[in-house]
Amino acid sequence: MALSSRLWRLLPLLRGAEQSVCQLARSWGSGGRCGTWGFRGSEVTGNTRAFKRGLLFSALSYLGFETYQVISQAAVVHATAKVEEILEQADYLYESGETEKLYQLLTQYKESEDVELLWRLARASRDIAQLCKTSEEEKKVLLYEALEYAKRALEKKGSSFAAHKWYAICISDVGDYEGIKVKIANAYVIKEHFEKAIELNPKDATSIHLMGIWCYTFAEMPWYQRRIAEVLFANPPSSTYEEALKYFHRAEEVDPNFYSKNLLLLGKTYLKLNNKKLAAFWLVKAKSYPAHTEEDKQIQTEAAQLLTGL
């Protein structure tokens, strides 16, 4: 429609230009010299056809460019609509706990450069790796695959909080295959990306929760790992249970009951701080959390065991 309207606007100009050329030819047809440039009538008359051909060629070139623009814009709109449709399907499958179907859907677009697709691919690959039926060999491949998707997402758009979050998660996951030195060194990178994700989106409870896990992990680091870290690094990463608790509570304030593991870790952190009353409060909430995923079921079991110990 846009191209047709442009064509109709252009045609009167072409007809007007053609008439002007013919008028010039007739007025200068006496053979006398005319105007500053001194054209002879015969020269103008002789070149009329060539001029019209040139004008027509220019018009067609213009229309070709206009066609290209319209088609390109339509292609972009179509591609954007298609990506949004895929994302809607992906989010529905994720919320429904359809881990394998989600992975099958997204891997069809693994060559995409869309950041929203890429970080979801990282998440889906990681979720498949976490399934009980996934072999250790397959798990390793999937975790490195997830890291590659997250890395591409981050390279594509450094202002995406989700790309920072999943890049940090995936680096943490592959740490088990990299050795203690690399794992500790990566801790600085992981913390940096979690903090960046929180900065970019302070309302994302998951990023805040993950920062809490980072603190909890280094607060309970075994003494021998701490000793290795002190040997390898002048300032090894460290944290406290109090700091971890702060992040877990902050995540809960942003989005109450958003994640069963956050409830569990609130209980476990209070246990580490010898506050059994508050530990029991949060462990009961974790045990009662509706089990939508395999992880939720595992958390229910762990919470029940910890409550029995109390």
From Swiss-Prot:
Sorted keywords for this record are: Cytoplasm, Cytoskeleton, Microtubule, Repeat, TPR repeat
The superkingdom of the source organism is: Eukaryota
The subcellular location is: Cytoplasm; Cytoplasm, Cytoskeleton, Spindle; Cytoplasm, Cytoskeleton, Spindle pole
Entries under InterPro entries matching the protein = RMD1-3_a_helical_rpt, TPR-like_helical_dom_sf
Give the main localization category: cytoplasm
Could you tell me which residues carry N6-succinyllysine? 165
Q: Where are the TPR repeats?
A: 168-204, 222-258
GO MF annotation, one: microtubule binding
* Any single Gene Ontology cellular-component annotation: mitotic spindle pole
Q: Could you confirm whether the keyword Cytoplasm appears in this record?
A: yes
Which PANTHER family does UniProt cross-reference here? Answer: REGULATOR OF MICROTUBULE DYNAMICS PROTEIN, REGULATOR OF MICROTUBULE DYNAMICS PROTEIN 1
Oligomeric state and interaction partners are given as:
Interacts with microtubules.
The UniProt entry's sequence similarity note says: Belongs to the RMDN family.
Entry protein name: Regulator of microtubule dynamics protein 1
